[in-house]
């Protein structure tokens, strides 16, 4: 019989041997631990494939075993699969390992420096894995233990280690929304850097400044975030780890987006995507990180269709790496939910957006406390979707139920945002604006007006008179005055202001202009100004023609398959533009 007609393919000798060891796991358990790390991991992966999670969990919960498995660097994706399966199964392997490491650090406090140095190295690898896997609280516990060991020796090597600890701590605290601890972590890192400087030593500051930028961005301190991104870019040098370079480019791009420096943002994020795929591969979590930020850029420059495609690609990667109930998967679901909501806003088809929003909330509520800040944005997205579904619903009872659910979600999001950021913050203002829109749908017009005005005042003071966020809130207040309160003169002024900001930032084909143009057509019809009605019908027709031509060909992923510039050229181009323009804030 020809080989191609075989209905099965024989196992390799190696795989047969691994299967034999697993079949005799109980008897050979101790011997397995003496195998080289790659072979030892393959035995454990076979346990995972056979669904023997209790046995796998008992192995991975032992710090010595897991530390050895972590040395099999080329198996990291497969390790994420095993680890997530254990977490989903209810084996709290992340917290067990973090506790074991912390306890070991307390035991060796009196040991010599070499023992502590070895423990710190183990901690960096363990904490790094937990951080990459999204188990931020456990990673934080590990890094705090490492930092404690560093403080026991007042010498140069441990100052370098302490700086690295602080950078990693800042990263996991940012990821876990512990922003109140972020600035003190940064200051501690600076203290150690100053010590090093006094002794003629320098630690590269790119990663630290990049994490500070992420912290300030999350708190909506956009001017400060931009300033520190510039400082981080200055620190990019030859020999810096690619991961650090990619992360700094990502953060700088996001800071440029919110400052509406779109050309700079495009150059930075496209190079970050290219660099991540070229270095890590197209199935790596770091590549998915860059895709999420690329999607953020595309959404903000109004290339909504491509942004949805990029967010979907990022989610696919994260699901293939992590699967299960993982925070990285949840954030990708949320980003895709919001972009799908924006994309389908005109059509009213929100099934896909709602699915992803509910998946995000389901995952977050399963693995994090019910008052965790990450829930604020997911609940906000679901509330926006429910409101639109309610508006299109013909059953009054169902409409009221959906609006009430959206109201509860918005209020919960607002309370979480105020607790984390205070009243005077862009995130809080967004929630006020969302409540304003909802109250309009609920026909509570005075409450709606109050919320919109509050949102506009906060955004104007924080972002200036001509920001995109201000235009959104101004347009929403115009809609309220036009459709429900008959305040046509006020509505007209607000519509024209919103249109002017939109055109200035995004050009004549900006998608948000449609709602302002339609609002003005309705307004001029209401007051009998038919000349203006005709004028804006023509404007809307021209806008539609522009939209048909816009983004009709470009494939966003194809667009980043190569980079015309080296990393050094990208960095220098950014810094030279900065020098020409002068400081932003």
From Swiss-Prot:
<protein>
    <recommendedName>
        <fullName>Amyloid protein-binding protein 2</fullName>
    </recommendedName>
</protein>
<feature type="repeat" description="TPR 1">
    <location>
        <begin position="50"/>
        <end position="83"/>
    </location>
</feature>
<dbReference type="GO" id="GO:0031462">
    <property type="term" value="C:Cul2-RING ubiquitin ligase complex"/>
</dbReference>
<comment type="function">
    <text>Substrate-recognition component of a Cul2-RING (CRL2) E3 ubiquitin-protein ligase complex of the DesCEND (destruction via C-end degrons) pathway, which recognizes a C-degron located at the extreme C terminus of target proteins, leading to their ubiquitination and degradation. The C-degron recognized by the DesCEND pathway is usually a motif of less than ten residues and can be present in full-length proteins, truncated proteins or proteolytically cleaved forms.</text>
</comment>
<keyword id="KW-0677">Repeat</keyword>
<feature type="repeat" description="TPR 8">
    <location>
        <begin position="514"/>
        <end position="547"/>
    </location>
</feature>
<dbReference type="Pfam" id="PF13374">
    <property type="entry name" value="TPR_10"/>
</dbReference>
<keyword id="KW-0493">Microtubule</keyword>
<dbReference type="InterPro" id="IPR042476">
    <property type="entry name" value="APPBP2"/>
</dbReference>
<comment type="subunit">
    <text>Component of a CRL2 E3 ubiquitin-protein ligase complex, also named ECS (Elongin BC-CUL2/5-SOCS-box protein) complex, composed of CUL2, Elongin BC (ELOB and ELOC), RBX1 and substrate-specific adapter APPBP2. Interacts with APP; APP interaction inhibits the E3 ubiquitin-protein ligase activity of the CRL2(APPBP2) complex.</text>
</comment>
<dbReference type="GO" id="GO:0005874">
    <property type="term" value="C:microtubule"/>
</dbReference>
<keyword id="KW-0539">Nucleus</keyword>
<dbReference type="GO" id="GO:0005654">
    <property type="term" value="C:nucleoplasm"/>
</dbReference>
<feature type="repeat" description="TPR 5">
    <location>
        <begin position="333"/>
        <end position="367"/>
    </location>
</feature>
<keyword id="KW-0813">Transport</keyword>
<dbReference type="InterPro" id="IPR011990">
    <property type="entry name" value="TPR-like_helical_dom_sf"/>
</dbReference>
<feature type="repeat" description="TPR 2">
    <location>
        <begin position="120"/>
        <end position="153"/>
    </location>
</feature>
<comment type="pathway">
    <text>Protein modification; protein ubiquitination.</text>
</comment>
<dbReference type="Pfam" id="PF13424">
    <property type="entry name" value="TPR_12"/>
</dbReference>
<keyword id="KW-0206">Cytoskeleton</keyword>
<dbReference type="InterPro" id="IPR019734">
    <property type="entry name" value="TPR_rpt"/>
</dbReference>
<keyword id="KW-0802">TPR repeat</keyword>
<dbReference type="GO" id="GO:1990756">
    <property type="term" value="F:ubiquitin-like ligase-substrate adaptor activity"/>
</dbReference>
<feature type="repeat" description="TPR 7">
    <location>
        <begin position="471"/>
        <end position="505"/>
    </location>
</feature>
<feature type="repeat" description="TPR 3">
    <location>
        <begin position="206"/>
        <end position="239"/>
    </location>
</feature>
<feature type="repeat" description="TPR 6">
    <location>
        <begin position="429"/>
        <end position="462"/>
    </location>
</feature>
<keyword id="KW-0833">Ubl conjugation pathway</keyword>
<keyword id="KW-0472">Membrane</keyword>
<dbReference type="GO" id="GO:0043161">
    <property type="term" value="P:proteasome-mediated ubiquitin-dependent protein catabolic process"/>
</dbReference>
<dbReference type="GO" id="GO:0030659">
    <property type="term" value="C:cytoplasmic vesicle membrane"/>
</dbReference>
<keyword id="KW-0963">Cytoplasm</keyword>
<dbReference type="GO" id="GO:0046907">
    <property type="term" value="P:intracellular transport"/>
</dbReference>
<feature type="repeat" description="TPR 4">
    <location>
        <begin position="288"/>
        <end position="321"/>
    </location>
</feature>
<dbReference type="GO" id="GO:0016567">
    <property type="term" value="P:protein ubiquitination"/>
</dbReference>
<dbReference type="GO" id="GO:0006886">
    <property type="term" value="P:intracellular protein transport"/>
</dbReference>
<keyword id="KW-0653">Protein transport</keyword>
């Amino acid at each position: 019989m020809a080989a191609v007609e075989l209905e099965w393919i024989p196992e390799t000798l190696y795989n047969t041997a691994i299967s034999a060891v697993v079949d005799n796991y109980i008897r050979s358990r101790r011997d397995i631990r003496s195998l080289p790390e790659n072979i030892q991991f393959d035995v454990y992966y076979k346990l995972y494939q056979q669904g023997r999670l209790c046995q796998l969990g008992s192995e991975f919960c032992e710090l010595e075993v897991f530390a050895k498995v972590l040395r099999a660097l080329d198996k990291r994706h497969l390790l994420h699969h095993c680890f997530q399966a254990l977490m989903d199964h209810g084996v709290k392997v992340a917290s067990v390992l973090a506790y074991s490491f912390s306890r070991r650090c307390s035991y060796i406090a009196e040991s010599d420096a070499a023992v502590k140095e070895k423990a710190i190295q183990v901690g960096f690898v363990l904490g790094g894995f937990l951080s990459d896997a999204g188990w931020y609280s456990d990673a934080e516990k590990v890094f705090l233990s490492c930092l404690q060991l560093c403080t026991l020796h007042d010498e140069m090597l441990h100052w370098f280690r302490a700086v690295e600890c602080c950078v990693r701590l800042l990263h996991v605290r940012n990821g876990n929304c512990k922003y109140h601890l972020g600035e003190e972590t940064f200051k501690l890192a600076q203290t150690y850097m100053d010590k090093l400087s006094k002794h003629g030593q320098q630690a590269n500051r790119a990663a630290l400044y990049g994490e500070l930028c992420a912290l300030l961005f999350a708190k909506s301190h956009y001017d400060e975030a931009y300033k520190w991104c510039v400082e981080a870019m200055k620190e990019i040098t030859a020999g810096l780890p690619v991961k650090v370079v990619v992360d700094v480019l990502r953060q700088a791009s996001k800071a440029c987006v919110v400052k509406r420096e779109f050309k700079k943002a495009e150059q930075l994020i496209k190079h970050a995507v290219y660099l991540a795929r070229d270095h890590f591969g197209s199935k790596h979590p770091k590549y998915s990180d860059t895709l999420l930020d690329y999607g953020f850029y595309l959404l903000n420059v109004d290339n909504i269709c491509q942004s949805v495609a990029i967010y979907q690609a990022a989610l696919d990667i994260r699901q293939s790496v992590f699967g299960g109930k993982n925070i990285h998967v949840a954030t990708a679901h949320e980003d895709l939910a919001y972009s799908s909501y924006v994309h389908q806003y005109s059509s009213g088809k929100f099934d896909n957006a709602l699915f992803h929003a509910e998946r995000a909330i389901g995952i977050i509520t399963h693995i994090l406390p019910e008052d965790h800040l990450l829930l604020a944005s997911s609940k906000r997205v679901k509330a926006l979707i429910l409101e639109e579904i309610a508006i299109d619903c013909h059953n009054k009872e169902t409409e009221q139920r959906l609006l009430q659910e959206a109201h509860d979600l918005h209020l919960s999001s607002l309370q979480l945002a105020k607790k984390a950021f205070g009243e005077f913050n862009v995130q809080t203002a967004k929630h006020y604006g969302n409540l304003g829109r909802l109250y309009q749908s609920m026909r509570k017009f005075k409450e709606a007006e109050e919320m919109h005005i509050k949102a506009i005042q906060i955004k104007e003071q924080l972002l200036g008179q001509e920001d995109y966020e201000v235009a959104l809130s101004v347009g929403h207040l115009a809609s309220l005055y036009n459709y429900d309160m008959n305040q046509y003169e006020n509505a007209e002024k607000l519509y024209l202001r919103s249109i002017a900001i939109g055109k200035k930032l995004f050009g004549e084909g900006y998608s948000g202009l449609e709602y302002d143009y339609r609002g003005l057509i309705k307004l001029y019809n209401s007051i009998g100004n038919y000349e203006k009605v005709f004028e804006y019908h023509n404007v809307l027709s021209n806008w539609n023609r522009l939209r048909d031509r816009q983004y009709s060909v470009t494939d966003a992923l194809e667009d980043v398959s190569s980079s015309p510039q080296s990393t050094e050229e990208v960095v220098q181009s950014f810094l030279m533009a900065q020098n020409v323009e002068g400081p932003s804030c």
